[in-house]
């Protein structure tokens, strides 16, 4: 899988509200209404990530969950990261 160009990443981010680029990764922080809502979302996303063998870095801080996506084997952002960002958005309903 090939790394995406800066132009491809910027174009994709235009359709992914809340996501930002940080170096070689995509990042989104989401604040949930309650701690367990965030945990529930993480569980659903983890199940999907396992099924596609592409795993996000996840940081949980009370009601705020931060997702960081990068294709480590390629050294940057690929289509797999964009697809996972879209799935995360669907799973969290935003």
From Swiss-Prot:
Family from the record: Belongs to the pterin-4-alpha-carbinolamine dehydratase family.
Enzyme Commission identifier(s): 4.2.1.96
Species this chain originates from: Mycobacteroides abscessus (strain ATCC 19977 / DSM 44196 / CCUG 20993 / CIP 104536 / JCM 13569 / NCTC 13031 / TMC 1543 / L948) (Mycobacterium abscessus)
GO MF term list: 4-alpha-hydroxytetrahydrobiopterin dehydratase activity
Protein name (database record): Putative pterin-4-alpha-carbinolamine dehydratase
Catalysed reactions listed for this entry: (4aS,6R)-4a-hydroxy-L-erythro-5,6,7,8-tetrahydrobiopterin = (6R)-L-erythro-6,7-dihydrobiopterin + H2O
Matches recorded under NCBIfam families: PRK00823.1-2
Enzyme class: lyase
Record CDD domains: PCD_DCoH (cd00488)
One GO biological process term: tetrahydrobiopterin biosynthetic process
Family annotation (InterPro entries): PCD_sf, Pterin_deHydtase
UniProt keywords, alphabetically: Lyase
Gene3D superfamilies hit by this protein: Transcriptional coactivator/pterin dehydratase (3.30.1360.20)
């Amino acid at each position: 899988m090939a790394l995406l160009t800066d132009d491809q990443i910027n174009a994709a981010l235009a359709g992914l509200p809340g996501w930002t680029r940080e170096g070689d990764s995509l990042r989104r922080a989401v604040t949930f209404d309650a701690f367990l809502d965030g945990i529930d979302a993480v569980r659903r996303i983890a199940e999907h990530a396992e099924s596609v063998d592409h795993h996000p870095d996840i940081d949980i801080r009370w009601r705020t969950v931060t997702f960081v996506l990068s294709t480590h084997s390629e050294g940057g952002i690929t289509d797999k990261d964009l697809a996972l960002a879209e799935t995360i958005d669907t799973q969290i309903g935003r």
